[in-house]
Regions:
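Catalytic histidine-centered segment of alpha/beta-hydrolase-like enzymes
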Residues: 269-279
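Conserved alpha/beta-hydrolase "acid-adjacent" motif
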Residues: 240-249
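Mobile cap/lid helix-loop segments that gate and shape the active-site cleft of serine hydrolases
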Residues: 24, 30, 40, 184-223
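Short beta-strand/loop motif that positions the catalytic acidic residue
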Residues: 227, 233-235, 239
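Short, surface-exposed "cap/lid" segments of acyl-processing enzymes
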Residues: 52-55, 60-83
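Primarily recognizes the serine-hydrolase "nucleophile elbow" in alpha/beta-hydrolase
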Residues: 118-188
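N-terminal cap/lid segment of alpha/beta-hydrolase-fold proteins
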Residues: 4-55
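Catalytic nucleophile-loop/oxyanion-hole region of alpha/beta-hydrolase
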Residues: 72-81, 92-133
Length: 295
């Protein structure tokens, strides 16, 4: 049974079911198309299209979780992608280089994600995608990357993460238990998730905020506020992987920068219920996607 590696924030709280037990015991649905956006074997995405292709569909650019590690891939996102496309939303689920893959971390993973996001315009030349309604969304570590995409127009031009001015606008950003602020994650989690005696955030970013401040200024969504788009932060009340105070703390900082950010805490849901379309939590989450995708 696969689960994201961590030491639970709530060590005395027993999850009501083993993470991923239901969705990983089944073969995920197949996407309509698997399309490379780069030359590396990890630079591809799965495209899910609504059955009615007569009109252009809003599109969710989705980033999977797994603490940016190569042990975890996009396969499990097939379940939510299939559900969203059945409700009229296209999904471009992105794979990217993760820790353990050559060139991953800072800046490689960020550049992969930026290139895959901009590749949506290429997809729209062939498939009926509404480029004025592109939503970035992600689960866990993927939530960090999704919100980073929404804020990268603020990246300093001298940064390694600076790319030509983004040509594709973000309509809204949705975090599913995302680590949307790396500084807050390190502080609130008290370094509860480690690799080689240091927080995994530091592995991914190339050091701590004190060691590589420029990396965090360019790669942390909290440093890129205001994002300038509606932001939706969704988390299960029983989540034992992501700091429970993170969504509210992030939203408060966003509001202070005059951004629009809402927090939805779902009673009884854990870290994985919110990406499982068979869970009780999912109808609430689907409704947020549907509302966010409207013009």
């Amino acid at each position: 049974m696969r689960q994201f590696p961590s030491h639970p924030i709530h060590p005395n709280r027993t999850p009501k079911r083993p993470p991923f037990m239901d969705i990983l015991s089944q073969m995920p649905p197949r996407a309509d198309h698997r399309i490379p956006y780069g030359k590396d074997e990890n630079q591809f995405g799965d495209l899910w299209l609504p059955h009615d292709t007569r009109t252009k569909a809003p599109v969710v650019v989705f980033l999977h979780g797994g603490w940016w590690q190569s042990t975890y891939d996009l396969a499990y996102t097939g379940f939510l992608a299939d559900d969203l496309r059945n409700h009229g939303i296209a999904v471009w689920s992105i794979e990217y280089r993760r820790l353990g893959n050559p060139g991953a971390g800072y800046p490689g993973t960020f550049l992969d994600v930026a290139n895959a996001f901009e590749f949506t315009r290429t997809l729209a030349a062939t498939y009926p995608l509404a480029l004025d309604r592109v939503i970035t969304s992600g689960h866990s570590a993927g939530g960090h990357l999704a919100f980073w995409l929404a804020g990268r127009h603020h990246i300093p031009e001298t940064s390694l993460l600076a790319t030509p001015k983004p040509g594709l606008a973000v309509h809204a950003a949705i975090s599913l238990a995302g680590v949307v602020d790396l500084r807050l994650t390190r502080d609130l989690a008290s370094g509860w998730i480690f690799s080689h005696d240091k927080p995994l955030v530091d592995d991914f970013m190339g050091g701590s905020p004190e060691q590589v401040p420029d990396h965090y200024r360019a790669g942390n969504p909290g440093d890129l506020l205001p994002l300038g788009v509606p932001q939706f932060l969704i988390q299960g009340a029983e989540d034992n992987q992501v700091p429970p105070d993170l969504p509210a703390r992030y939203a408060a900082n966003a509001h202070a920068q005059h951004d629009t950010a809402s927090v939805t805490i779902i009673p009884g849901a854990d870290h994985f219920d919110i990406v499982d379309p068979t869970s009780r939590a999912w109808p609430t989450i689907r409704d947020i996607f549907l509302r966010a995708s409207k013009p």
